[in-house]
């Protein structure tokens, strides 16, 4: 079975006409038609306190009135709707009258005209009066002078020419151009394949406007009475790093907020050696001022070591320490600068003096004993069989001059070291039996009982890790 189609209920106004008298209206129909909903009540009572303009909200404007109810708002009619006096009946409607509200019978009133197209114009006149008002007396027509109009129905038209009255002489006025100054007009003609500006000649009689491109330019005539003032930018920085030092405003407006210090003269310039600032932003630039004594000096606000709390607050006065410089008396005799005749003069050495001849002495002499180049080259067989190969080896023959280093007394050692007879290096003999043995490694002496050497890490004793139980 198919579901029943839900039928839309009739509008509230259609239900109100049939169910009001029978008393079977739904609960939402009567308040909506009679304008007694919650929204209507809010507008009705709120309109007493506020002004809502000419909207008719809360002012009980005239509309369709139901029996026993209040007026409602009437919407505009559809486009093309008209209303006339005939739809009202034989009742006469005059300005300033309102239709009476009957009890129990709905009344039809004059509705508004269409919103899109106006209807028939309605005028408040009486039905008994004529629609067209004619004047009591009609003025006589004097007609046209010297003009006849034919009223014949034939195709021929009679035309009567008006003859001029007076002499037949006709005055001919010659138009002469006025004496005007000559104007200079510059014409800019653009010779283009797409557009050619037409060139017209200037005329002072007929049309003066043309299609020329007129450019007006030049300088002013006479003295303009002005002055050239350079443009100045206000508020813009003049340097890459603007220097704005915040100045203290304390004590300027309030006299009691000024801070006073006790000035203490000092003769120790070391007081100014250690300068510390809590906030360098408020420190002014160094200034040279003249004191009461007339001498220039150094001054600084100094806070001596006083009581200090646990929070770091220092309790105690601040002193203004001043160090005045010494005064140069006027009676001091100036010592003249004199040069003693016995003073030894200065010797001037010319920089561009010609160089004298000098002898070149070689610091090193190359001989056979210093040769480290290989003398003989031989080959050593490596491997066996097919893989046997010969590797060239070089035999070096080099000698190095060495000296004799002897420790202790020369009589202690019976054997003497072998030395090179051609060596010119001196022998070093240390005649001291208490000298600690020294080992020479690559020409550097190493003391066995001192700490001037470092062993290789492989020779150091390794530490064993302790095992924790």
Swiss-Prot record:
Give all cystine bridges in this chain: 19-25
Note one Pfam family from the annotation.
Late_protein_L2
Composition bias, Low complexity:
414-429
Q: How is it modified after translation?
A: Highly phosphorylated.
Single GO molecular-function term? SNARE binding
Annotated GO biological processes are: endocytosis involved in viral entry into host cell; microtubule-dependent intracellular transport of viral material towards nucleus; viral DNA genome packaging; viral penetration into host nucleus
What are the record keywords, sorted?
Capsid protein, Cytoplasmic inwards viral transport, Disulfide bond, DNA-binding, Host endosome, Host Golgi apparatus, Host nucleus, Host-virus interaction, Late protein, Microtubular inwards viral transport, Phosphoprotein, Viral penetration into host nucleus, Virion, Virus entry into host cell
Q: Which InterPro entries match?
A: Late_L2 (IPR000784)
**Would you tell me the Gene Ontology cellular component terms?**
host cell; host cell endoplasmic reticulum membrane; host cell Golgi apparatus; host cell late endosome membrane; host cell nucleus; viral capsid
Question: What are the subcellular locations of this protein?
Answer: Virion; Host nucleus; Host early endosome; Host Golgi apparatus
Q: Where is this motif: Nuclear localization signal?
A: 1-10, 461-468
Region labeled Disordered — which residues? Answer: 401-429
Task: Please give the coiled-coil regions recorded for this protein.
Answer: none
Q: Which family does it belong to?
A: Belongs to the papillomaviridae L2 protein family.
Its annotated function is as follows: Minor protein of the capsid that localizes along the inner surface of the virion, within the central cavities beneath the L1 pentamers. Plays a role in capsid stabilization through interaction with the major capsid protein L1. Once the virion enters the host cell, L2 escorts the genomic DNA into the nucleus by promoting escape from the endosomal compartments and traffic through the host Golgi network.
User: What assembly does the database describe for this protein?
Assistant: Interacts with major capsid protein L1. Interacts with E2; this interaction inhibits E2 transcriptional activity but not the DNA replication function E2. Interacts with host GADD45GIP1. Interacts with host HSPA8; this interaction is required for L2 nuclear translocation. Interacts with host importins KPNB2 and KPNB3. Forms a complex with importin alpha2-beta1 heterodimers via interaction with the importin alpha2 adapter. Interacts with host DYNLT1; this interaction is essential for virus intracellular transport during entry.
- What name has this protein been given in UniProt? Minor capsid protein L2
Organism, scientific name: Bovine papillomavirus type 1
